[in-house]
């Protein structure tokens, strides 16, 4: 899709011109490429078309940020869970954080406006998209600062491939 082409255009330009100013474009386009593409798949599957695009974008941005904030609070308060389950604790902590963010942002009678299963899939995918993109961008920045741009690009590619499944 267009977002993947945009990512590789940034990567090509970075290697061709060796300009460090292209790194934020690599991080941003790479972190959002696959989650946004997956989100638009769910948007197209929502045959009722009863959820406006602004609502979805609001959930991507605010839901992604809020779910990361909730997950960080949960990680901080459940350290024993991390010791007991290791890396598996991430899913146990992050998934309720995404659900919590969705429930907070969709509170009240607005939930009654979206009674269909595909509505729930789309709304949940929007929050998950924001979470995945912001988390991937954070990991990419960390690797880029502490290692090399090549390893950062590899990390973005691996997380991009895996992001629709987590």
Go through each PLM region and give its residues:
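Hydrophobic alpha-helical segments at protein termini of multi-pass membrane proteins
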Residues: 1-166
